[in-house]
């Protein structure tokens, strides 16, 4: 498998075409961003850590019956994935109140949200990733009712799995972001990445952040935080879920 043309450069990844038209080459970089890209820095080993965490979780979710784009990880910063037409939506799952949800609704931080909340945001840096409700999604033809039904069902299953997975290693999954795409046969798959860049994680004993909030809020070096998450996931495997 060889990469060919650079197709896309994102905030923390580069995506290349390959010599297989149905397969993409995803390269994780060391760049960290926050505040819609206004804050940027190069973080040592971040690409390797995000690739390792994403690979581990994609493999586990695939084994649990969740359709994903994951195929292989040939080196420390590369993931080989199925080519998918991405839905232009970010799916945010909130298990506990945090971030702007707290200020928007004037609720206590870390209040448990039961049932968990699903939110949809239009994926557009230019527009600031605005919130979208289902009616807007359908009216703008960004996804079909059947696709959104599948997204909701898969997201519930993924949330159940990940919540239990992190709880087993002493971490609370506060909220997180998912992205989906469709393969050429129409199959909806979980795509993008699964890492502390997109998760809000809190240590159950200390209350410390174990995610990109450490960088966003200048709380200290980010690399040891991601190393801690990976170490815990590796030490206690999926059999404990």
From Swiss-Prot:
Protein EC: 6.3.2.6
Q: Which InterPro entries match?
A: SAICAR_synt/ADE2_N, SAICAR_synt_PurC, SAICAR_synth, SAICAR_synthetase
An example of a Gene Ontology BP annotation on this entry? Answer: cobalamin biosynthetic process
Q: Name one GO molecular function term.
A: ATP binding
The UniProt keyword set, sorted, is: ATP-binding, Ligase, Nucleotide-binding, Purine biosynthesis
Q: Which domain of life is it from?
A: Bacteria
| Pfam families to which the protein is assigned, alphabetical | SAICAR_synt
The metabolic or biological pathway listed in the UniProt record of this protein is:
Purine metabolism; IMP biosynthesis via de novo pathway; 5-amino-1-(5-phospho-D-ribosyl)imidazole-4-carboxamide from 5-amino-1-(5-phospho-D-ribosyl)imidazole-4-carboxylate: step 1/2
Q: Does the keyword Ligase apply?
A: yes
Q: Which reaction does it catalyse?
A: 5-amino-1-(5-phospho-D-ribosyl)imidazole-4-carboxylate + L-aspartate + ATP = (2S)-2-[5-amino-1-(5-phospho-beta-D-ribosyl)imidazole-4-carboxamido]succinate + ADP + phosphate + 2 H(+)
| Family indicated by similarity | Belongs to the SAICAR synthetase family.
Protein name per Swiss-Prot or TrEMBL:
Phosphoribosylaminoimidazole-succinocarboxamide synthase
* Organism field: Lacticaseibacillus paracasei (strain ATCC 334 / BCRC 17002 / CCUG 31169 / CIP 107868 / KCTC 3260 / NRRL B-441)
């Amino acid at each position: 498998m060889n990469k060919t043309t650079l197709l896309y450069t994102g905030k923390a990844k580069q995506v290349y075409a390959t010599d297989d038209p149905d397969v993409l080459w995803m390269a994780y970089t060391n760049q960290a961003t926050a505040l819609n890209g206004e804050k940027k820095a190069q973080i040592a080993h971040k690409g390797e850590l995000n690739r390792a965490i994403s690979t581990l979780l994609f493999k586990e979710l695939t084994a649990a019956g969740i359709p994903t784009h994951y195929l292989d990880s040939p080196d420390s910063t590369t993931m080989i994935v199925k080519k998918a037409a991405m839905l232009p939506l970010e799916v945010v799952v909130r298990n506990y109140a945090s971030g702007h949800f707290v200020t928007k609704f004037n609720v206590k931080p870390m209040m448990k949200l039961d049932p968990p909340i699903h939110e949809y945001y239009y994926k557009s840096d230019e527009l600031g990733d605005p919130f979208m409700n289902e009616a807007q999604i359908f009216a703008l033809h960004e996804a079909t009712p059947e696709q959104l039904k599948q997204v909701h069902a898969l997201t519930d299953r993924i949330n159940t799995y990940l919540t239990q997975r992190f709880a087993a290693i002493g971490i609370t999954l506060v909220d997180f972001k998912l992205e989906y795409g469709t393969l050429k046969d129409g199959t909806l798959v979980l795509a993008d990445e699964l890492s502390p860049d997109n998760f809000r994680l809190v240590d159950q004993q200390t209350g410390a952040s174990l995610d990109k909030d450490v960088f966003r809020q200048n709380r200290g070096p980010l690399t040891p935080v991601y190393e801690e998450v990976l170490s815990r996931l590796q030490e206690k495997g999926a059999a404990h879920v």
